[in-house]
Amino acid sequence: IVYLSLSSSVGGANMNGHSIYTGKHGRGCEFGHMTIVPRGRKCYCNRAGCLDAYCCASILSDFTGGDLHAFFEEVKAGKNKGLINAFDEYMDYLAIAVHNLRMCYDCDVILGGYVGAYMSEHIETFRNKASELNPFEKDASYIKVCHYKTEASAVGAAVYYIDKFVKELGE
């Protein structure tokens, strides 16, 4: 399973069985710094075209004074074409990233973080965008929305220690 966190920055994790992939240098799953647009927007890492520069939460919330909830309420109301177009473009870039993750890992991708908490209402539209990019399958049901809408990383960290504790009880 790949978890893609769409919050103040973009990050993620890859669970393989009961193990989290961290990589050789502890930087595994730095999805926010995958290049999705060569020579694109400047990222806070001083490179250009990183996913973070296209899909962090502030890309959307900046349209509504930093209020992500207000952004999604406006999109839901359907009256502000500028916001609807901005969200459509956001989903286009996100679809590229999710497609790339699917091609690399061939597993489910969970959308989480601040933006992931709002994706339930838009998941079918988003799945359609992602499926258009995939040459092997049209079914994009592998894209999931997080169950925990807030504090997902805290829950994930706790689960690791709870699992470890339960295993120690069995020894």
Feature-to-residue mapping (PLM):
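Phosphate-binding/catalytic loop of phosphoryl-transfer enzymes
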Residues: 1-46, 162-171
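ATP-binding/phosphotransfer module of carbohydrate and carboxylate kinases, centering on a glycine-rich
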Residues: 47, 51-171
